Regions:
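Long, domain-scale functional regions
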Residues: 1-287
Length: 287
């Protein structure tokens, strides 16, 4: 079944789609998207879903724009960032300053420049938060800097023991991790373009969990990247970020330099611009 549920985000009450939803299709910029949620400010968050409409449960590489590493390097805590700071840093703040673009951010920005920038579709996009939650797990003493072993919040999922991370959050815990273009009240203002990735919180709320699930609308039959850091392991100096496994399981993670991770960009449409359609695959919402 499909559901519309409610949770708080940085802007108010957000209504998110969960499960086998069949009325959240959008056609925009000649591509198909799925509505993930109505943000607290009324804007509409959508995720890329292909050049044609795909049914829930359908496995297709068309449901992503391509494949990319999250970061081409992996040997420092900094590389769990959608943007990152200094490698070899002695402080958390220096490692996680939003100075350098990640590999996946550059990939997504290039897609935006090729498909959205300079077109009439730009005017329909809104600025809203994309969360790259680099907060440290409450069971961990790691510093998040250099090559120190560090468990980030999503090292523990709600399916694991200890109740370290039993609440999904649509409010990004740290403003430095709340990626926006111009909103510096709620976000960091670090983005050039209003496009990003889904967090693991959003994926779990949509129906991803710790077991295979091909029935919810985010299933693609491919491994694809989330924006949520997992951990940095000092043996081998390896940075890991969460993703969604090919069976739909949101428990997936990969070394950040894994170059075969699928990329599914996300952006936010301005409130009330989807004036046509009923949201079905055959009659998607449209401008």
């Amino acid at each position: 079944n499909g559901y519309l549920c409610k949770a708080k985000d940085a802007y108010g009450d957000s209504y998110y789609y969960r499960g086998n939803v069949t009325n959240n299709y959008v056609k925009f910029a000649d591509k198909y998207w799925r509505i993930v949620r109505i943000n607290g400010d009324g804007t509409v968050r959508v995720i890329y879903d292909g050049t044609s409409a795909h049914a829930n449960g359908e496995s297709s590489s068309d449901r992503q724009i391509g494949k990319s590493a999250f970061n081409s390097s992996y040997n420092d805590n900094a590389y769990v960032g959608y943007m990152y700071g200094a490698t070899g840093a002695s402080t958390y703040a220096a490692a996680h300053a939003n100075t350098n673009d990640s590999t996946i951010k550059a990939y997504i920005d290039n897609w935006y420049k090729a498909n959205i920038l300079g077109t009439a579709n730009e005017e329909y996009l809104a600025d809203n938060i994309f969360c790259n939650d680099r907060s440290i797990s409450n069971d961990n003493t790691g510093t998040g800097a250099g090559t120190t072993r560090t468990n980030y919040r999503w090292y523990w999922g709600p399916w694991e023991s200890g109740n370290h991370n039993d609440n999904m959050k649509l409010i990004c815990p740290q403003q430095n991790d709340a990626f926006t273009v111009s909103d510096t009240t709620n976000g960091n203002g670090a983005l050039t373009y209003p496009i990003g990735l889904l967090s693991t919180d959003e994926i779990v709320l949509a129906g991803g969990w710790s077991k295979e699930n091909s029935g919810y609308y985010l299933y693609s039959g491919q491994y694809w990247w989330a924006s949520s850091p997992d951990y940095f392991y000092f043996v081998g100096y390896n940075a890991f970020v969460r993703g969604v496994d090919s069976d739909g399981d949101a428990h997936g993670h990969s070394l950040v330099n894994y170059s075969s991770g699928g990329v599914r960009p996300v952006f936010n449409l301005k409130a009330e611009v989807l004036a046509q359609g009923t949201g079905t695959a055959s009659d998607p919402y449209r401008i």
